[in-house]
Amino acid sequence: MLDLFGNEIIERAAGSNKIFTCLAASNHSGGDRQSEDYYATEPKAVQELLAVESFSDTILEPCVGGGHIAEVLKQNGHKVIAQDIIDRGYPGTIIRDFLTQLVNYNDIISNPPYVMAREFCEHALDISPEGVKVAMFLKLTFLESQERKAFFQKYPIKYLYVFSKRMNCAKNGEFEKYHSNAVAYGWFVWHPA
């Protein structure tokens, strides 16, 4: 049996109360999470963003990781300022905690650690002047929660691009090992005024 969203459901044995369980879940279980929350972005997700949004020539990628976003940006003619709090071997990475950066004058495209996504988005918007675009690749569940309600009231998104086919985020950038796309992601785009 399937629910309205196409998820398989299980019905409890006859003679008892019916309980339905959706078998869709996040592909990141608590004990299996990467310690620094490093899940690389499928390059196709960046190509899809660039097909619908234009960005300045120079882009800041504050969570560059292995360069999966940065490489697509470079292939499309952008100069990328690559930084991360950890050196994951991507050439030219500036080792810096983005949350301590005081100012930014470049468009930002990134997939921040989900456990700190609100902090990254808020900081990006706080340090970026009018005219700078901020695009963050986030789980659609980022739209939920009381804590983020105040955030969205203060920083309303301009566009939310939701994929018709789910994108993959690979733990430690190992796409050949991790093929799950159990989580729905989207590009959250702000145009600070």
Regions found by a protein language model. Name each.
Residues 1-193:
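Class I S-adenosyl-L-methionine-dependent methyltransferase catalytic core
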